[in-house]
């Protein structure tokens, strides 16, 4: 995993697409996937340097708020390596199976 993980959770896909587009245009970050949380909530993940991820999530939250509802924005600096297993880059979706496997590995 890179130096930081950024997440934006919105209500609805339109706001999430706006957020993701703005994040990728605002800073040198990599799209790491997305995950539906249920009840219309969806979360996008980006990775990169701490400053770039912070700038990207700020821009993404602002863009999403113009067209919908931003539920949460979070930047994790230097996330634990096991967290990388949660994001499945082959599908572009967060992998709950991989997250469960990482959790079991620690036991």
Predicted feature descriptions by range:
Residues 1-40, 47-107:
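Long, contiguous binding/interaction regions
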């Amino acid at each position: 995993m890179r130096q930081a993980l950024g997440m934006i959770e919105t209500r609805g896909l339109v706001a999430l697409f706006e957020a993701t587009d703005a994040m990728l245009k605002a800073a040198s970050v990599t799209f790491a996937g997305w995950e539906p949380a249920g009840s219309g909530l969806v979360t996008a993940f980006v990775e990169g340097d701490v400053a770039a991820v912070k700038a990207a999530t700020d821009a993404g939250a602002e863009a999403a708020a113009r067209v919908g509802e931003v539920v949460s924005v979070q930047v994790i600096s230097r996330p634990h390596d096991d967290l990388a297993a949660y994001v499945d880059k082959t599908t572009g979706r967060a992998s709950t199976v991989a997250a469960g496997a990482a959790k079991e590995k620690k036991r």
